Amino acid sequence: MSPTFFIHTFGCQMNMADTEIVTAILVEGGFAPAEDEGTADMVLLNTCAVRANAVDRAGNVLSHLKGMKRRRKGLVVGLLGCVPQYEREQLFGDFPFVDFIVGPDNYRDLCGIVRSVREGEQRRAFIDYDQQETYAGIDPIRANRVSTFLPVMRGCNNHCAFCVVPVTRGRERSVAFDRVIAEVAALEQAGYREVTLLGQNVNSWCDADKSLDFAGLLEGVSHAAPSMRIRFTTSHPKDISESLVRVIGERPNLCKHIHLPVQSGSSRMLDLMKRGHTREEYLDKIAMIRELVPGVAITTDLIAGFCTETEVDHRETLSLMEAVGYDTAFMFYYSVRPGTWAARNLPDDVPEAVKKARLQEIIDLQTAMSRELYQREIGKVVEVLAEAESKRSASQLMGRTSENRAVVFSREHFMPGDLVPVRITAATSATLSGEALVQPSNP
């Protein structure tokens, strides 16, 4: 019988995509997925190091696995992803029951690593950087049959003051244009209805000779899979070009949603964060986007309480939120990440209580803006890609609009994968509800 494995995944979409790659590598190597950790011969944690709370959540699962390993002789526990690359061999001191740690560039070696551990080899760390690794040639085992992820680049060269990604993921490297086009076309042929192109800084993608930028890739992908919805994330404001935005506005299967992290509305804070743009430059990009892509939804990331942030800086963040009118936002208060420029050079001098209070103001404002925006959708007919059965009721489906707005609607005869016109009848700050109108569009 094949040894079995179960993977806990934390963090971003790239980690989710990496879990699908790891699953494919293990299955090809003779391992089999388990239904849950309780029946698995090996439990892996694919970890995130971007924020302290993500590391803490992985630590809580590890504490649970420590007891499980005492009770189950032969259980193998491994750590994958950004935390091993970030904390390195120190993890063995913190979690002595962990059998191995593997960084994001070393997954091809995973089967051999596991077999060595099962044969009694001592704990080891596999955390070398490989600036060529994009996992080309590996066909991921995908968890979703409607919408999926496709990494088109890895790493980041920006070195924002607060961010560990350049430490955990290394420098930027792009998947070749022809390979991306072939993979997207294969996904369309396999019946997928939507793909999200992924990168830590996806719009800095370029071909090997730098003759083609992300706008060219996005246009090529759009033509290669005309029946699929195409999304991308995450973007850096300084790399959002007019040519890229024009492609989004012109191509009908490119989703009208751009995630554009700003982090702060204060130019002083943006300079300290090493973001490479000012408040005014960001707002100019927003104006250009809204002009070229009417009805576009813009979402963002926001950090409250970064080093030396004053009440004036915080108020500038609130006013920028109002000026942009974000659909939604990922909102956090600042936590120091050792190894970053900010950790080495700036004081973490905003009291935690102040950070939390400012974060709550940001959340309250965004919730109110989202509710107002979603309320304006009531009465409209929107096209929804049905993704799955609603978690609340088997009689409902859940899906998303081109603008990435979540919609719950009556199931009727529709199935996941259908494109369904839905009349919106109700809204909260996070979800639209509605009634399906006609036959699905499903070529």
UniProtKB/Swiss-Prot annotation:
GO terms for cellular component: cytosol. Signal peptide: none annotated. Residues 3-119 form the MTTase N-terminal domain. It is found in: Cytoplasm. Keywords: 4Fe-4S, Cytoplasm, Iron, Iron-sulfur, Metal-binding, S-adenosyl-L-methionine, Transferase, tRNA processing. CDD domains: Radical_SAM. GO terms for molecular function: 4 iron, 4 sulfur cluster binding; metal ion binding; N6-isopentenyladenosine methylthiotransferase activity. [4Fe-4S] cluster 1 binds at C12, C48, C82. It catalyses: N(6)-dimethylallyladenosine(37) in tRNA + (sulfur carrier)-SH + AH2 + 2 S-adenosyl-L-methionine = 2-methylsulfanyl-N(6)-dimethylallyladenosine(37) in tRNA + (sulfur carrier)-H + 5'-deoxyadenosine + L-methionine + A + S-adenosyl-L-homocysteine + 2 H(+). It holds the Pfam family UPF0004. The keyword Ribosomal protein does not apply. Disulfide bonds: none annotated. Its cofactor is [4Fe-4S] cluster. Transmembrane segments: none annotated. Gene3D superfamilies: Methylthiotransferase, N-terminal domain, tm_1862 like domain. Binds 2 [4Fe-4S] clusters. One cluster is coordinated with 3 cysteines and an exchangeable S-adenosyl-L-methionine. It comes from the Bacteria. SMART domains: Elp3 (SM00729). Catalyzes the methylthiolation of N6-(dimethylallyl)adenosine (i(6)A), leading to the formation of 2-methylthio-N6-(dimethylallyl)adenosine (ms(2)i(6)A) at position 37 in tRNAs that read codons beginning with uridine. Monomer. Belongs to the methylthiotransferase family. MiaB subfamily. This is tRNA-2-methylthio-N(6)-dimethylallyladenosine synthase. It comes from Chlorobaculum parvum (strain DSM 263 / NCIMB 8327) (Chlorobium vibrioforme subsp. thiosulfatophilum). The lineage of its organism: Bacteria, Pseudomonadati, Chlorobiota, Chlorobiia, Chlorobiales.
